[in-house]
Amino acid sequence: MKRIGVLAAAALCALGLSGPAQAQSVRIGYWSSGISLGFGAVLEAGKFMEKEGLTPEYVKFPDVNAPTKAMAAGAIDFAIAASAGTSLSVTADGLPLSIVLATQVADLDFVVPEDSPIKTMADLKGKKIGTSPSGSATAAITSAILETNYKFTPGDYQGVPGNDPRLAQFLVQKDIDAAALRTVTIALLPDAKLRRIGSFRQEWKTLTKQDAPPILGVGLMRNAWMAQNPDAPAKVVAAMRKAYAFGQADKPAVARILQASANLSAADATAYAALWDSIYTVSLEPADIASLKREFEVFKAVGAVQGTLPDTALDPRPYARSKTIP
């Protein structure tokens, strides 16, 4: 698999975003699709950052890797769900960024068309497999599963990049043989007639010999902003924790927010909201840190990242301090 590369600072100009943030303001970026959309919409609509005394500026990106590019360029201060793979790579490369939270769990299934002759994961050898673009945690985890659990070489399968709706369309059109799709996407496509042949959770458990699911997205924070606003990182994390708890407690409210902000139908919004507890997390406990370190080693084994992950790449202090905020 192609290595997750260091991201160019020139992205700041290309993205056309504003300059350095003022004290107690925070520029927050997230992908306007996939499972990032749901949490971002609830975070905004509930004004959770404002309730912690912060002034947020939300920046939505059309590409899964764009928030990390913006972070590397200094264009945003916090990404609510940066790709775990890219985040591990850039922090190992020494960029002045810190992982302060695990925020998304890789709750994906490997699926094929209902009438496909493919029955098992081993049958994917020589096939076209749809996944998120190179550089995403989804792509890195897919490669790790195929190459470690099934002894595939990179030449034994063809990865086809795309976002979930596009990959689902490719499957229906028989342009690809299989795809790794988020469970929330599958829930929103009841008429697509897809059949599950494997899951990220089970395959990761086989790979790592541990029960913890793979982490798909992380809260990534800019070190300079953290230094300039020493009490603000804990407030950001507190807001994230409260938004997560809100979603756990009030699924109908989440569905209403998704209908309004994402133009989902009532049925689709309800199906999305029902998956809240299984696709999101807001934590950086010792077990999460251990899981991310293990993930780095798995990615390194398949060439997705290089080097050594420094202990400073994972900063649990904002999470710990957030627990003191009522």
Regions found by a protein language model. Give the residues of each.
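Bacterial N-terminal signal peptides
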Residues: 8-16
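Short, solvent-exposed loop/beta-turn-alpha elements that line the ligand-binding surface or hinge
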Residues: 47, 51, 201-212, 278-287
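Secondary-structure end/capping motifs
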Residues: 226-304
